[in-house]
Amino acid sequence: MLHTLMKSPFETNVSLVISMLKKSDDFLALQDGVLIALKDNIFLKSIIMSPVKLYLIKEDVYARGIRKNISREFILINYIHFVSLTLKHKKQMTW
């Protein structure tokens, strides 16, 4: 399953999101969801320890001016790669 976080992690039940992640899943943050990747935030350790690959939409990271402040555990991708992830996963959960 592809889990997409579109809202700020401070407006979402991130603990629930993380508890739902399985090894075969992928996690993508976009829009204000990219804030989950900020270094030293309260959710970072938990999301990094999850068994999934972590992706961020590059354009959203740059639009918020946070590129130098995000964890290296996240992979920056563009919207073309986002489409590839949606094709890879038959199911998607948007948070």
UniProtKB/Swiss-Prot annotation:
InterPro entries: DsrEFH-like, Sulphur_relay_TusB, Sulphur_relay_TusB/DsrH. The keyword Transmembrane helix does not apply. It comes from the Bacteria. GO terms for biological process: tRNA wobble position uridine thiolation. GO terms for cellular component: sulfurtransferase complex. It is found in: Cytoplasm. Part of a sulfur-relay system required for 2-thiolation of 5-methylaminomethyl-2-thiouridine (mnm(5)s(2)U) at tRNA wobble positions. Heterohexamer, formed by a dimer of trimers. The hexameric TusBCD complex contains 2 copies each of TusB, TusC and TusD. The TusBCD complex interacts with TusE. Belongs to the DsrH/TusB family. This is Protein TusB. The lineage of its organism: Bacteria, Pseudomonadati, Pseudomonadota, Gammaproteobacteria, Enterobacterales.
